[in-house]
Amino acid sequence: SMITEQRRQAYIESMNAHDLEISEKWMPYGYYVAAAAKDHVANLLSLGASAIVCGNDLLASGAIDECRAHGYRVPEDVSIIGFDDIPISAQLNPPLTTVRQDRIELGKCGFFALHSLINHVSVSKNLLRPQLIIRNSTAPVRK
């Protein structure tokens, strides 16, 4: 999707800005469902990943399960972060650190964009500012 590609590009730009290695092996792609974590988490762990950033909270919940299945503790061994802050995120074990989007504002932007398109008015870009919700699935970087 366009959003996935934008997130990927932001990741690459951030890695470049900090002179860090960029490799496809660190950027697996899968469906945005918990079961998709099975396809990638074991490989990331075998590469020595100490943190996994997931495209949404469902994928992050699956990543937590997969880490446990492979004997890793979250967050002691691996930090996991999601995106969306769906209601179940705070109830996971451990509660999931995530990025919250303002759903009301997102809905308003969608409405105004659709209204503009219906009325043949060009649609402008809106950048919504997400909020990092720190819970217990992340820990400080290990040295």
Which positions does each model-derived feature cover?
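Bacterial carbohydrate/catabolite-sensing allosteric modules
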Residues: 1-143
